[in-house]
Amino acid sequence: MAPKKKVSGFIKLQIQAGQANPAPPVGPALGAHGVNIMEFCKAYNAATEDQRGNVVPVEITVYEDRSFTFKLKTPPAAKLLLKAANLQKGSGEPNTNKVGSVTWDQCKEIAQTKMEDLNANDLDMGARIIAGTARSMGIEVKGATA
């Protein structure tokens, strides 16, 4: 087995799928660690081509020889909820001012999408996490069982 490479840095970014470019915030974050920015942009854009329109978080592990690996995450729950409710942004006062609504089935659908990143044992628990995120954004959850 080849010897393990030594990790020199860890970067977390949220970039539009298929639209990574060397401009901020990508360029400065990667440049500080000595990563080949264009190489990352091409690899990221190729990997996220099928998810265009979503923000896809990425965790980049940078090694001492300036090589890197990256792991794609699922889009943030807040962005998926805004898309499901057809909103631009959440409420500034979520407890008093409701800006939209989603159904329990939509919460389950989002939980299904995010299941690998959620800290939940089953789909219902995942949907409850998503419903909590919705409530904190001022989005009403209709037909909730919790």
Curated annotation (Swiss-Prot):
| Annotated keywords | Methylation, Ribonucleoprotein, Ribosomal protein, RNA-binding, rRNA-binding
- Extract the SMART domains matched here: RL11 (SM00649)
A Pfam family matched in the record: Ribosomal_L11_N
Q: Which InterPro entries match?
A: Ribosomal_uL11, Ribosomal_uL11_bac-typ, Ribosomal_uL11_C, Ribosomal_uL11_C_sf, Ribosomal_uL11_CS, Ribosomal_uL11_N, Ribosomal_uL11_N_sf
List the Gene Ontology MF annotations in alphabetical order. Answer: large ribosomal subunit rRNA binding; structural constituent of ribosome
Q: Highest taxon of the source?
A: Bacteria
Q: How is it modified after translation?
A: One or more lysine residues are methylated.
Its Gene Ontology cellular component terms are: cytosolic large ribosomal subunit
A biological-process GO annotation:
translation
Q: How does it assemble?
A: Part of the ribosomal stalk of the 50S ribosomal subunit. Interacts with L10 and the large rRNA to form the base of the stalk. L10 forms an elongated spine to which L12 dimers bind in a sequential fashion forming a multimeric L10(L12)X complex.
**Entries under PANTHER family matching the protein:** 60S RIBOSOMAL PROTEIN L12, LARGE RIBOSOMAL SUBUNIT PROTEIN UL11M
The similarity annotation says:
Belongs to the universal ribosomal protein uL11 family.
Question: Which HAMAP family does the record match to this protein?
Answer: Ribosomal_uL11
Q: What does this protein do?
A: Forms part of the ribosomal stalk which helps the ribosome interact with GTP-bound translation factors.
* Protein name (record): Large ribosomal subunit protein uL11
- What organism is this sequence from? Corynebacterium kroppenstedtii (strain DSM 44385 / JCM 11950 / CIP 105744 / CCUG 35717)
Gene name linked to the record: rplK
